[in-house]
């Protein structure tokens, strides 16, 4: 099963039209990413303040399928996937009452924080990717059996 994160849309997330401001969807997705790391026993303080390695987002996109309003109960599902020795990508699906309202992608590259050059993903991230991949594949197999 993919990792899931529950979040309620707050007033501060919205714009003058009363819907979630477009850039805030990526912030909400990043919250889900952080929760998934923490759920895998990755220390967030160490992860984000490690002086030797960083994971900048080099690509991000969001498709908005329906508006999200204050008070909406969001369920964010994420599936991270390794796409090279130094890169990974996370796909997000945001739903409200089982209706998909947005889909997003973030691509991350592992770099040496001093030289800013690419480097291989550390073992803890490879393990996080592998665990989430297995969980997502297992959920997909269960779903396909239910359809048959």
UniProtKB/Swiss-Prot annotation:
Keyword entries, A-Z = Hydrolase
Matching entries from InterPro entries are given as:
4-hydroxybenzoyl-CoA_TE (IPR050563), DHNA_CoA_hydrolase (IPR022829), HotDog_dom_sf (IPR029069)
Please, which domain of life does this record's source organism belong to? Answer: Bacteria
Q: Does the keyword Hydrolase apply?
A: yes
In this protein, the active site sits at 15
Example of a GO biological process term: phylloquinone biosynthetic process
Keyword Hydrolase among record annotations: yes
Q: Which residue windows are coiled coil?
A: none
Q: Which reaction does it catalyse?
A: 1,4-dihydroxy-2-naphthoyl-CoA + H2O = 1,4-dihydroxy-2-naphthoate + CoA + H(+)
Q: Give the EC number(s) under which this enzyme is classified.
A: 3.1.2.28
The molecular function terms in GO held by this entry are: 1,4-dihydroxy-2-naphthoyl-CoA thioesterase activity; fatty acyl-CoA hydrolase activity
Name its pathway.
Cofactor biosynthesis; phylloquinone biosynthesis; Quinol/quinone metabolism; 1,4-dihydroxy-2-naphthoate biosynthesis; 1,4-dihydroxy-2-naphthoate from chorismate: step 7/7
- UniProt similarity note: Belongs to the 4-hydroxybenzoyl-CoA thioesterase family. DHNA-CoA hydrolase subfamily.
Function statement: Catalyzes the hydrolysis of 1,4-dihydroxy-2-naphthoyl-CoA (DHNA-CoA) to 1,4-dihydroxy-2-naphthoate (DHNA), a reaction involved in phylloquinone (vitamin K1) biosynthesis.
Q: Which HAMAP family match?
A: DHNA_CoA_hydrolase (MF_02101)
Kindly provide the name given to this protein in its UniProt entry: 1,4-dihydroxy-2-naphthoyl-CoA hydrolase
Source organism per entry reads Nostoc punctiforme (strain ATCC 29133 / PCC 73102)
